[in-house]
Amino acid sequence: MYYMLIGFIIVVIAIISAGYILKRKHYQRINELEETKIKLRERPVIDELSKVKKLKLTGQTEALFESWRSSWDEIETRLFPDLEEVLLEAEMNTDRYKFRSATYVENDIEQMLVVIEKQMDQILGGLKELLISEEKNAKESRMTKEKFAELRREVLTRGFKLGDTLPYVETKLDELAENLNRYDLLTDQGDHLEAREIVLIVQKEMKVIEAQMERIPSLLHETDTILPEEMNKLRAGYEEMVRKGYYLAQMELDKEITRMKTQIDKMKRNVINLDLDEAEQGIEELHNEIDLFYDTLEHEAEARHFVKENHSPTSDKLQRQNTVSDALAEQITEVKQTYHVAEDDLAVYLKTSAKLSEAKENFEQLTALIASGEIAYSAAQDTLKEIDAALISIGAEQDKFAEELRSLRKDELEARDDAERMRRAIVTLDRKMERERLPGLPEEYLSLREHMGESIDALEKRLEEKPLNMKAVTQDWRIAEEDLNHLTEKAEEMMENVRLVEHVIQYANRYRLRNKELADELVQAENHFYNDYQYKKALEIAVTALEKVETGAFKKVEKAYESKVSVDDIE
């Protein structure tokens, strides 16, 4: 019982302590919120409103001031009283140990303080800006009016440099003067915000006018002096070159100068209307056009030098190529008596001959135009270059064709010599096979041998035709070469098989008396070897039989054969 009482007392003390701690914590937060409220109340909103109210306000400024005052009245008459009530509610909840309710209320108080602070910031910021604006307007107004007076003086002293743009500039200045008068009126009426907008507009416009006054004299100098002088110099240079014999009608300079004068008039109107960017762009484009005309004249002078330097050499080159072409025609006539010349090959010559005639005709026309002065030197230069390129191409094609004609005789002699060589090669191959003392020759080889002879006969017969068709000769020649190579390969293979069969049977004889199956298969191999001369088949049968008795024996025999070691020495 005693211990229960002690435990109860401890629990009560713990509850009271916890309540005290929580209560103290909530009062601490409430006090902090109260301090924030006091700081907000101490902000000088009323003082700032009083300062601004002393100013003479109208228009936008007055409307803004009224909105700020209305916002402050709301804070003073509604938001602060509401805040007091909620603070009292938080204290009551804390006293009654309604800590959860107290927490909710404290959070609401924080939000209310944020709203009040935000509204007060807006009011004070606007009032401050208005006071500064009034002071700044006065300062900037003085500076703006001084700058405007300077512009007026500059127009009076340097107006002659503005030419026909002077009335337009003066009109702009008159508009600015009206805006400055309006600024004074708005300031007197107390509409300081709208007055500030006017000051900013005037400052911006003055910068534009100042920049325009800097650019106008140079642009007028371009349209009134520089460009006309440039065109006069261009015309003088053009006329001098015409007197020297240049054909320049393609430039249509009179028409172009008339057009450029119209462009200058348009650019001058742009300057007068203060469309300076468009005028500047047009002036730059016109300078570029004049430069292009000068480039054309310079190109004509360079082209004249080129024509004078290259006309005679091109004429000589044309004559030389005509001589080559005539010689080639004679060569074709001679060759056709002995050799057949394909129509395709003749077409190549005829095509180059036609190109040569065209080049000659173009050169003659060009020479006549140069003599009469009816062609621009640039066009004459282009034509000369085209003729020269054509002559280079024609020369290469005709040289190639001439070489092909010369090679016909060379190819004929080589084909005749090779036919003799192939006959000698067959005789040599026959003798080599005789020395091998073969039991006989298989039908397949005899057929190849006969076909080889026919191929050489066909080649020799083709070489006796008149006129000689070298394309057909070349085809028969290639066939004969292929047949000889094939025959030689078969002969070498056959002799190789014969030697290997002899070595394999000789090695297998050591097992012959002891192995009847081997003996029978060796007899079969020997029948193919001696009777029908199927040496490859005989080798296959003998090798298969030997491998049954001794695996790997053929490799030993083959190695001994390659090393020229006697079969009897193989272990």
Swiss-Prot record:
Function noted in UniProt: Negative regulator of FtsZ ring formation; modulates the frequency and position of FtsZ ring formation. Inhibits FtsZ ring formation at polar sites. Interacts either with FtsZ or with one of its binding partners to promote depolymerization.
Coiled-coil intervals, chain numbering = 169-214, 249-298, 326-374, 400-438, 474-529
- Organism of this sequence: Listeria welshimeri serovar 6b (strain ATCC 35897 / DSM 20650 / CCUG 15529 / CIP 8149 / NCTC 11857 / SLCC 5334 / V8)
**Membrane topology type:** Single-pass membrane protein
User: Which InterPro entries does this entry report, sorted A to Z?
Assistant: EzrA (IPR010379)
Q: Which GO terms describe its biological process?
A: division septum assembly; septin ring assembly
Extracellular topological intervals: 1-3
HAMAP family according to UniProt: EzrA
Question: Does the record bear Cell membrane in its keywords?
Answer: yes
Q: Which residues lie on this side of the membrane: Cytoplasmic?
A: 23-571
Q: Which family does it belong to?
A: Belongs to the EzrA family.
**Keywords assigned by UniProt?**
Cell cycle, Cell division, Cell membrane, Coiled coil, Membrane, Septation, Transmembrane, Transmembrane helix
Under the cellular component aspect of Gene Ontology, which terms does the record hold? plasma membrane; septin ring
Q: Where in the cell is it found?
A: Cell membrane
Its transmembrane ranges are: 4-22
Name this polypeptide is given = Septation ring formation regulator EzrA
